[in-house]
Amino acid sequence: MQTSYVIFTDSTGDLTPALIEQCELQVMPMAFNLDGADYRNYPDGREMSPHEFYEKLRGGSLCKTSQIPISEFVDAFTPVLEQGLDILYLAFSSGLSGTFQSSRLAVEELKEKYPARRMICVDSLQASMGEGLFAYLVAQKRLQGAALDEAARYASDLAPSDRKSVV
């Protein structure tokens, strides 16, 4: 069934490229710094594979993450809004990153230019595979034909009831 919205999430959910495609998700890559070098966490591992990343951590490398900037949300959301579609963003836990807040600020900025479009941000309260499972479950609702409000309500109900983080 055709729905009139796109689901975005971020790469900290550790979903495979195949699952991302199957679920019709748009993924925002998170930035990280490892031993002084900056990278983006793309699901396809184009800048660093998960294997290499964890090998470096086991070897004593230090990693720092940074939230997705407002400008990157604006750049990612704008083409979708210009197509006349709405947005549901499923964010990395606000307890671990400022990314959720950045997404909300981007939405406030975009509402001025696209007042007829709906943009909903939901804090997953998750990280890693817990966040990935969260995004997968919400995406399944969308694929089953759930409208934006129904999918957002499902996501909001799901978030506080499952506070586990699978590592």
Positions of PLM-derived features:
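Residue-level detector of anion-binding/catalytic polar loops
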Residues: 26, 86, 147
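Short, charged beta->alpha transition segments
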Residues: 70-80, 105-107
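Glycine-rich phosphate/diphosphate-binding loops that line cofactor/substrate pockets in enzymes
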Residues: 1, 75-87
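A short helix-to-beta-strand connector/capping loop
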Residues: 3-4, 22-25, 114-118
